[in-house]
């Protein structure tokens, strides 16, 4: 599993997302949840997406593994994101980001043997992973790092 572009995941609406469609743009993956202290980061994620959308794809990945803070159905998640934060960036189906049922996307993002860069553990909701325009992991950022932080934006373009 050396290539991000070969990994399969569905959108919140159940349609396949082809990461290969995003070659030439950076991708920011964020595990998201509706009932988290960091949920307000949806606003900054949307701001970041709008500001850099010619060069950046933002992908929210719902996960219910941290404090059961994303219990909603696909329809509930979509409505929450649109009504409360005007989210227009991609949201995937709900997946596990750690553990024995970890989704292959997160197996790639968190394991050096897959991404070629570094290993990490997803510690909480709104942890961010930035991938460059060639599908290579740049770095990860803990929840406390705001989406609009220069730690992230300096790598976009």
Give the ranges of each region predicted by the language model.
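N-terminal "domain-start" segment that seeds a small globular fold
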Residues: 1-20, 40, 104
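Conserved helix-turn-beta segment immediately C-terminal to the redox Cys motif
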Residues: 25-26, 35, 39-64, 81-85
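Thiol-based oxidoreductase modules, predominantly thioredoxin-like and allied folds used
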Residues: 55-73, 88-99
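Short, internal strand/loop/helix patches
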Residues: 75-123
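Thiol-/selenol-based redox modules, centered on thioredoxin-like
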Residues: 107, 112-157
């Amino acid at each position: 599993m050396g290539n991000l572009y070969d990994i399969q995941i569905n959108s919140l609406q159940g349609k396949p997302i082809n990461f290969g469609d995003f070659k030439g743009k950076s991708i920011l993956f964020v595990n998201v949840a509706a009932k988290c202290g960091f949920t307000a980061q949806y606003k900054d994620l949307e701001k970041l997406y709008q500001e850099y959308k010619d060069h950046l794809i933002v992908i929210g990945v719902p996960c219910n593994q941290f404090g059961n803070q994303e219990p909603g159905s696909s329809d509930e998640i979509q409505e929450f994101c649109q009504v409360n934060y005007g989210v227009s960036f991609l949201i995937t189906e709900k997946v596990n980001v750690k553990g024995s049922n970890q989704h292959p996307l997160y197996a790639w993002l968190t394991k050096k043997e897959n991404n070629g860069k570094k290993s990490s553990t997803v510690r909480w909701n709104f942890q961010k992973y930035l991938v460059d325009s060639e599908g290579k992991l740049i770095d990860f950022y803990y929840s406390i790092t705001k989406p609009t932080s220069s730690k992230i934006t300096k790598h976009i373009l």
